Amino acid sequence: MDAFKTHLAIVASGAPLSREQARAAFDDLLSGEVTPIQAGAFLTALSVRGESEDEIVGAVSAMRARMLPVAAPEGAIDIVGTGGDHSGSYNVSTLAAILTAACGVPVAKHGNRAATSRSGAADVLAALGVKIGLPPEALARCLSEAGLCFMFAQTHHGAMRHVAPVRTELPFRTIFNMLGPLSNPAGVTAQVFGVSRPAWAEPLTRVLATLGSRRVWTVHGSDGLDEITTTGPTAVVALEDGAFRHFTLDPREVSLPLATLDDLRGGDPEHNAAALGAVLEGARNAYRDIAVLNAGAGLVVAGAAGSLAEGVARAQEAIDSGAARGTLARLVAVSNA
């Protein structure tokens, strides 16, 4: 492991790794050939200095090379966030994914159990009856028959087991909190990507572009949410076929009322599942508003809506027509078949 020690020494000195060096270092980390002390020192030094774009690209490349892939139809997207906003909000991206799929855009959702919240995507979907941890063939069938699948990160990124104990011991977030959301097993090239730190928005959008994404909205709410928020404005860095654009969204621009963080605060998986089901049954509340806003963005990124207002209107109709309820029912049925 002389090469890893060399890379560790570079990072410990405060200097950045090249993309190729980062790829090699993360190949070593994910192969289980690095001692816990070396891994902890490496991740700590990276976190203290801050990861460069080349380091993130190299690390994601190592992750993607080891992941269990899923075959997805052309035009599939993901709606995902880095987590870590400590808001305890409802499962916004999960409901937004259901609404987007109900509008005819295939969604290959990638996620995990709760880390800093009480209910992650895997937790709430399991509470809704969706079978979690399916193999790639079953996930492809979910996409084909329901227009939506949920790829459980632990199933697709088995190499993460080599660094999991070290991550648990460290009292801060590491680069791996970014790598999961950046490593979609279906290889989607369009994403609504939420970040909990505003400083991550532009560099992670460039990282996604480097890795092959074509259309991305990287979003950060003014309240700290890693979603498009309804409590105020949201900063967006958009990637559209190689061009970058910065703008701010306000929910009132698409006729949605302002909410408070308390309005968006959820609970445990059963509580959040009940709230999600209530929205699909027609409840009009802050959870519905923030979900249709994020689904509207998903439709824009997918090229299925010409504007955010059009996307929001289509997401509203997916609820009111019962299409979204049907999408979830099909996902439950197909995942358990």
Curated annotation (Swiss-Prot):
PANTHER family this protein is in?
Answer: ANTHRANILATE PHOSPHORIBOSYLTRANSFERASE
Q: At which positions is anthranilate 1 bound?
A: 81, 112
Please state which protein family the record places this protein in: Belongs to the anthranilate phosphoribosyltransferase family.
The UniProt subunit note reads as follows:
Homodimer.
Q: Which reaction is recorded as catalysed by this protein? A: N-(5-phospho-beta-D-ribosyl)anthranilate + diphosphate = 5-phospho-alpha-D-ribose 1-diphosphate + anthranilate
The GO cellular component terms are: cytosol
Organism the protein comes from: Methylorubrum extorquens (strain CM4 / NCIMB 13688)
The record describes how the cofactor is bound as: Binds 2 magnesium ions per monomer.
Instruction: Name any one GO molecular function.
Output: magnesium ion binding
Binding of Mg(2+) 2 occurs at: 226-227
Q: What does this protein do?
A: Catalyzes the transfer of the phosphoribosyl group of 5-phosphorylribose-1-pyrophosphate (PRPP) to anthranilate to yield N-(5'-phosphoribosyl)-anthranilate (PRA).
Write the lineage as a comma-separated list. Bacteria, Pseudomonadati, Pseudomonadota, Alphaproteobacteria, Hyphomicrobiales
Known pathway: Amino-acid biosynthesis; L-tryptophan biosynthesis; L-tryptophan from chorismate: step 2/5
Entry annotated with the keyword Glycoprotein? no
Which GO terms of type biological process are on file?
L-tryptophan biosynthetic process
> Which InterPro entries does this one have?
Anthranilate_Pribosyl_Tfrase (IPR005940), Glycosyl_Trfase_fam3 (IPR000312), Glycosyl_Trfase_fam3_N_dom (IPR017459), Glycosyl_Trfase_fam3_N_dom_sf (IPR036320), Nuc_phospho_transferase (IPR035902)
Q: Kindly state which keywords UniProt assigns to this record, in alphabetical order.
A: Amino-acid biosynthesis, Aromatic amino acid biosynthesis, Glycosyltransferase, Magnesium, Metal-binding, Transferase, Tryptophan biosynthesis
| EC number, UniProt record | 2.4.2.18
Q: Where does Mg(2+) 1 bind?
A: 93, 227
Q: Which cofactor does it need?
A: Mg(2+)
Binding-site residues for anthranilate 2, renumbered to this chain = 167
Residues annotated as binding 5-phospho-alpha-D-ribose 1-diphosphate: 81, 84-85, 89, 91-94, 109-117, 121
This chain belongs to the protein called Anthranilate phosphoribosyltransferase
